[in-house]
Amino acid sequence: MIERLGFDNEKYLEMQSEHIRSRIDQFGGKLYLEFGGKLFDDNHASRVLPGFHPDSKIRMLSQLKDQVEIVVAVSAVDLEKSKVRGDLGITYGTDTLRLIDAFRGFGFQVASVVLTRFSGQPAAEIFQAQLEDLGLRVYRHYPIEGYPYDIPLIVSEEGYGKNEYVETSRSLVVVTAPGPGSGKMAVCLSQLYHEHKRGIQAGYAKYETFPIWNLPLRHPVNLAYEAATADLNDVNMIDPFHLEAYGVTTVNYNRDVEIFPVLKTMFERISGTSPYQSPTDMGVNMAGYCIVDDEVVCQASQEEILRRFYAEECRHRRGQTDGTAVYKIELLMKQLGLTPLSRSVVSPALAVAERTGDPAAAMEMPDGTILTGKTSELLGCSSALLLNALKYLGGIPDEIQLIAPSVIAPVQDLKVNVLGNKNPRLHIDELLVALSICAVTDPNAKRAVQQLQKLRGCEAHTTVILSEGDEDSFRRLGVRLTSEPKYQTSKLYHG
């Protein structure tokens, strides 16, 4: 079954790069572009806009490679606190190095690193020395009292004037960071101040994929962005400045709308006039023009909202949040007429769990067929589901054993009697190792292994929270997993 696409990725690459070129020309040949969101692996965009490739942003920038240089901003405050990226589990300092390696891997010139909010933090000084030993240029930008509202001070020699001027040589300076709150926008505006002092024409623009400004406020794509940022208190809203200036309704998010009057005044103080009449004007995002099937992206976005709902429920069950985000996403679901059972794989999994009294799982195949997996003495429900899916995709009869019990038994013995595990059932990674070994001599097992790539993009649901290992295995296989917010046992610790 061919996946329906809702987004024209090639059109996007061409249109987006051309629009950035025109913005560079608008400002006389130099543009500071604040790059928000994920550059290398925008999986959220690829899920809600089927056809959008996770690496589309970096591929788009690659079309401008000869004009681009990269500046990475990292907050000295975050370095001092050893702040960690939640999705990667690494510090902002380490992620700065990862970003630089990643950009260089694509052939980009990384100009420098800016330490923002620098006030002599020892960790920042150590990091600067490390970067300089690696041959990178490092600049310091300092805290400004009254930022961002004391504009006369900010746009003066005692404000931006105290910051070190970042030497750049190309027409498009992409300012990125390891995470939010790193000071990307402040770096851009500080540079505009210094460029203007030197008589160099330069401008600022912002690139973020979401919310998509030329879709309706309550469009599922934009609501999916609200669901994704429910823990950040971001909300989409009509851009009142754009409506007043042009009589056109566009969508932006609250933080950009709230700060725009300040930014406009800063632009006016730096160069005499503001090039923008609204926060929408500042953006360069062309994604909305590349949607080719609205029905497809609406359906995909609704699925994403449901996945976010279950993810936040499980985070709350684990004690990682206070549950506020769950209530916010529930409100978004009500606006679209969704309930938790709107997710097609939920009811089949719950039905098997109710019938057997044990954890169960369900997965939707590419052709729409829903398969289930139940808990047995040999396999957990997720492993059983995976075997059933591989049999189905490979056209292997259900009665054929892909892994003989005689193969599973010694693995269980090793787990329990040697390694001290209490659960003898095979996890997904253990199952796949056993299946791969069997594939050496068994054509059916070999055919099953060959089906693994077909699982990418499939939806799955389990009636209990899985182990971190099984969750990670599903993630690596590209399966979009959700779980009921409960554990298999009533124990207090779930390792």
Label each PLM-derived region with a short phrase.
Residues 378-394:
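A short, polar/charged loop-to-alpha-helix boundary motif
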Residues 187:
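Hydrophobic positions on the alpha1 helix immediately C-terminal to the Walker A/P-loop
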Residues 1-176, 191-352, 358, 365-367, ...:
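Flexible phosphate-sensing "switch/lid" loops adjacent to ATP/NTP-binding sites
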Residues 179-180:
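The conserved Walker
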Residues 203, 375-376:
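Residue-level structural signal for beta-strand termini and adjacent loop
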Residues 199-209, 393-404:
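Glycine-rich phosphate/pyrophosphate-binding loops
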Residues 397-423:
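Substrate-recognition/cap regions that form aromatic- and gly/pro-loop-enriched pockets
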